[in-house]
Amino acid sequence: MDRAAKADLVASLNEVFSTTSLVVVAHYKGLTVADMQKLRRQMKQAGATVKVAKNRLANIALDGTNVASIKPLLKGPTLLAYSSDPVAAAKVAVDFAKGNDKLVILGGAMGATALNPDGVKALATLPSLDELRAKIVGLVQAPATKIAQVVNAPAAKLARVFGAYADTANKDEAA
């Protein structure tokens, strides 16, 4: 890798570190290529990204960003998983690590807050941003639905009474 390519990589990593809300650091020693591809696919489906970069270049890219607290974790064969959703990368990384003991979560950073491995695992148990939005929409819509049912209930009861009266009137005329 020549100097220009290294400078481009540092610049792109710096932009990633500046814009993402969560970065997870993990050791991947012993992962097969197939396992790594599977992890990348799962991350992509969740809206997250996995990157393997030289630790020295990643350290340079971390300068001046909120997530600089992960610098001490960058030792050995490390991968960086990041996402703009504060939960996506952690959720996929933790789930993958449960099924594959070769991936070891070292920690991470959410904004300026450093996370230890337990912090990343706790973050993975939280609902995603889309799940929270769906719950809020459901909570907002529930009262409106109940109000509509209450308003329509008297009219429905009245319609049933008229229907029953019409049925009895038709039976009386037939008899």
From Swiss-Prot:
CDD domains: Ribosomal_L10 (cd05797). GO terms for cellular component: large ribosomal subunit. The keyword Oxidoreductase does not apply. Keywords: Ribonucleoprotein, Ribosomal protein, RNA-binding, rRNA-binding. GO terms for molecular function: large ribosomal subunit rRNA binding; structural constituent of ribosome. It comes from the Bacteria. One of its GO terms (biological process) is translation. InterPro entries: Ribosomal_uL10, Ribosomal_uL10-like_sf, Ribosomal_uL10_bac, Ribosomal_uL10_bac_type, Ribosomal_uL10_CS_bac. Transmembrane segments: none annotated. Part of the ribosomal stalk of the 50S ribosomal subunit. The N-terminus interacts with L11 and the large rRNA to form the base of the stalk. The C-terminus forms an elongated spine to which L12 dimers bind in a sequential fashion forming a multimeric L10(L12)X complex. PANTHER family: 39S RIBOSOMAL PROTEIN L10, MITOCHONDRIAL (PTHR11560). Forms part of the ribosomal stalk, playing a central role in the interaction of the ribosome with GTP-bound translation factors. Belongs to the universal ribosomal protein uL10 family. HAMAP family: Ribosomal_uL10. This is Large ribosomal subunit protein uL10. It comes from Methylobacterium sp. (strain 4-46).
